[in-house]
Design a protein with these regions (language model features):
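Alpha-helical structural context detector biased toward long hydrophobic helices
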Residues: 1-239
Length: 239
């Protein structure tokens, strides 16, 4: 596909039908790949939602789930915008590189997701992987940015790369998965209290771009005020 696209651009011809075909082919290819990762992880997600953490003792299931999480991280507007915003445009070469990255994002994002997923898998003995069980009256919420870094070092005033990461992924209103650099949770299963649920829901909302999702209006109402807070603060920061 990239070879065909290169030939088309080298020809100097501009044809809307050809460009539409190339774009559709790219989208279909990537959607099929993403669908395959989602299908592979579905069995794991169902088991984890039922608190069956032991399913991840199977190496294949662990690989599939880690790749799924990696792709969930990169398939967001927040991640894309953050990467592109970090690219310099101080000279012609940097502009060319930045434009190339933006143009190839459909492919690069997939490779970034695979790398993140492999990193999760290969470092699984060093990080702490935990299942969080929420039996409080406050359900977990999720958002258009489904995997968030809830480590305390994450700044709410600037979009800088944090030194550490506690990657948190809500699976259902009652169950979430977390991969910790910190020692906040040891590996295994943990029942958590309302204070932690409120903290994580607030961070999910703050790192959402537009939408938060819950199992009821009452579940999301207290957190609407936090939506996009991290990005709004950065928009108001002088450059």
């Amino acid at each position: 596909m990239q070879h065909l696209e290169a030939i088309y651009h080298a020809s100097g011809i501009q044809d809307q039908e050809t460009e539409a075909f190339l774009n559709a082919s790219q989208c279909n290819l990537m959607e099929n790949l993403h669908s395959s990762h989602e299908d592979a992880a579905l069995k794991v997600l169902i088991a984890l939602a039922d608190e069956q953490l032991e399913i991840l003792q199977d190496k294949q299931h662990m690989v599939e789930f880690m790749i799924f999480l990696g792709q969930q991280i990169v398939r967001t507007k927040a991640y894309r915008d953050g990467v592109l915003k970090g690219l310099h445009r101080r000279n012609d070469l940097e502009v060319e590189v930045a434009d190339a990255v933006a143009h190839s994002w459909w492919f690069l994002s997939y490779m970034f997701g695979m790398n993140i997923g492999f990193s999760f898998f290969s470092s699984r003995q060093d990080s702490r992987h935990a299942l969080l069980v929420n039996d409080t009256d406050i359900p977990f919420i999720t958002s258009d940015h489904p995997v968030v870094n809830v480590h305390p070092c994450v700044s709410e005033t600037e979009l800088s790369v944090p030194e550490y990461a506690d990657f948190y992924y809500p699976i259902s209103p009652r169950v979430a998965y977390i991969i910790c650099d910190s020692e906040r949770f040891t590996s295994g299963k943990h029942n958590i209290n309302e204070a932690i649920v409120n903290e994580f829901n607030s961070k999910v909302a703050a790192q959402a771009m537009v939408h938060i999702v819950g199992n009821s209006d009452s579940a999301i109402r207290p957190f609407k005020k936090h939506i996009g807070k991290r990005y709004k603060k950065n928009d108001n920061t002088p450059s």
